[in-house]
Amino acid sequence: MKTLAAWLRRPFGAALAAFLALRLLTSGLAALTAALTPVWITVEAPHDPTLLAQLEEGSPALRLLAAPWYRWDTVNYIEIAQNGYANRQNTIWPPLYPLLIRGGLALGLHPLAAALLVSNAAALGFFWLLYRLAEREWDAALARRTLLAVVIFPTAFFLVAGYSESLFLLFAIACVSAARKRRWLLAGLLAAAATWTRHQGLFLALPLAWEGLRTWPETRRQLPQWLGGLALPGLAMLGYGLYIHF
């Protein structure tokens, strides 16, 4: 027990514990809701009829544990992964998360399994990097409380659903960590990846700018790298616009 307790106090152990707690809690609540609600699946977007039939007519375990996650934005992301932006309404969703889902499809994964695998792996990575950043900036006790605050946040289930939030937060926290180490081009690339995950990634240029100004005497010696990092999120947004329209 002492060994387990010591392991859970390490960054990855704490991150894994937080992730598993969130994953088990949300899966349990989703399964309970699916079992008690007569109409347990609602699809609010164009969907894959074959995939929907598999979920509706599958085993009880499939209906309770998998089907509740095939709804809302997940449906759109899977559609983009399968068909690209043939449906122009889907252009409001940037392409990086669907591209990673498509990678899972190329490996033979079920579409919903691929979507959940990407988001859940990103959630675990986000918890790990968040713990490390909080521990570095403050201490281990506050890092653990930070993970707890994320897990009990009312919309934390977004992190383990087939949504892009966990991937976005993974890139965002990695961007901030790189900026704190004054690795400007890496921070800019991570901000660009966040922008290709969610449009809000464009605003990661603000903490990059602030961090550079806050440490200006050192930043001045890396001025080209800093300016290049600042430009990358905007270039990513421009590239996405060109990709969609041309």
What are these regions (language model features)?
Residues 102-103, 117-137:
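Transmembrane-helix motifs of polytopic, lipid-linked glycan transferases
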Residues 2-7, 136-137, 180-187, 211-224:
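Membrane-interface junctions at the ends of membrane-embedded or membrane-associated helices
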Residues 68-109:
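Short hydrophobic/aromatic helix or loop-helix immediately within or flanking a transmembrane segment
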Residues 151, 155-158, 172-177, 185-211, ...:
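Membrane-interface alpha helices of multi-pass inner-membrane proteins
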Residues 113-114, 130-152, 170:
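Transmembrane-helix signature of polytopic, membrane-embedded enzymes
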Residues 161-167:
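Short acidic/glycine- and proline-prone juxtamembrane loop motifs at membrane-interface regions
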Residues 1-57, 228-229:
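Start-transfer (signal-anchor) and selected internal transmembrane alpha helices
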Residues 25-43, 47, 68-69, 201, ...:
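Membrane-lumen/periplasm interface segments of specific transmembrane helices
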